[in-house]
Design a protein with these regions (language model features):
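Short N-proximal segments of mature Sec-exported proteins
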Residues: 2-49
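Compact alpha-helical subdomains of small soluble proteins
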Residues: 29-75
Length: 75
C-alpha cells in the first residue's frame, strides 16, 4: 500500500468538498462528508495519522479548496 501524504489527502478531500458544495451542502457538512469519504478510501487510521503529523494543515487545506472551487471559499 502506498503511503498517504498530506497533499494526496487534501486533493482528494478538496475534490469531494467542491462536489458536496455544488450539491448545496454548507461548508461544515461538505467537509465532514469529504473526510468521511477519504476515511472510506484510505482507511480512518491513515487519514488520522496524516492529519496528526501535518503542520499548517488549515492553511494548506484552505489553499487547495480555494483553487478547486473558489466560489465556495472566497465570499
Amino acid at each position: 500500500m502506498i503511503e498517504l501524504t498530506l497533499l494526496t489527502l487534501l486533493n482528494y478531500v478538496g475534490d469531494n468538498f467542491c462536489e458536496y458544495r455544488y450539491l448545496g451542502h454548507d461548508n461544515y457538512k461538505s467537509l465532514l462528508l469529504s473526510y468521511s469519504d477519504a476515511s472510506n478510501k484510505f482507511g480512518p487510521l491513515e487519514v488520522k495519522k496524516v492529519i496528526e503529523k501535518s503542520e499548517n494543515f488549515q492553511v494548506t487545506a484552505v489553499a487547495i479548496a480555494a483553487v478547486k472551487c473558489p466560489q465556495h471559499i472566497v465570499k
